[in-house]
Design a protein with these regions (language model features):
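Active-site rim helix/loop that mediates acceptor-substrate recognition in acyltransferases
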Residues: 16-35
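Acyl-donor (CoA/ACP) binding surface of acyl/acetyltransferases
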Residues: 1-10, 25, 38-161
């Protein structure tokens, strides 16, 4: 899948066998260090669809938890990426107690942007430190940090009491 030019259209190039092995090794390290990473996506009939999961990425020099996904070309457009990304978002929020989640997307990748938007991520900023010249960062606050005080609703603050 990572060697397929249509799947890797928005990457600098498809991955070679060696690059794919390095990517697998990176995923193994993620599991060792964090306890999570990318998961395999399969149909109910156990047909391989792609991968989706959570990894730490640098966005403009700061660490961000990213939901990422790859789907085999012939399986694209069927909702698999959206379903898997939503499950990852929920895992990040409910299990990892993550406060913020991002998706880092090539500006021309409209399908990936749609997936991000369908799971509640909105454009936040451009990242100029990635492997492409510019990457679009979509994100969402999953929960509020406990250190942030609750805000008073506007009408309550201006009652004149």
């Amino acid at each position: 899948m990572l060697a397929d030019p249509s799947v890797m259209e928005f990457y600098p190039s498809p991955k070679s066998r060696e690059e794919s092995q390095a990517w697998i090794d990176w995923n193994k390290r993620n599991y060792s260090e964090h306890g999570y990473g990318l998961w395999i996506i399969e149909t109910k009939a156990a047909e391989f669809v792609g991968d989706c999961g959570l990894t730490w990425q640098a966005v403009n020099g700061r660490p961000e938890l990213e939901v990422g996904y790859h789907v085999r070309a012939e399986m694209q457009g069927r909702g698999y990426a959206t379903e898997a990304a939503a499950a990852c978002r929920d895992f990040a929020r409910d299990v990892l107690q993550a406060v913020h989640l991002v998706a880092i997307i090539h500006p021309d990748n409209t399908a990936s942007r749609r997936v991000a938007q369908k799971i509640g991520l909105e454009f936040e900023e451009d990242d100029r430190a990635g492997m492409n010249d510019v990457r679009s960062v979509y994100g969402a606050r999953l929960r509020y940090a406990q250190a942030v005080p609750l805000c008073v609703r506007d009408e309550e603050a201006h009652r004149g009491e």
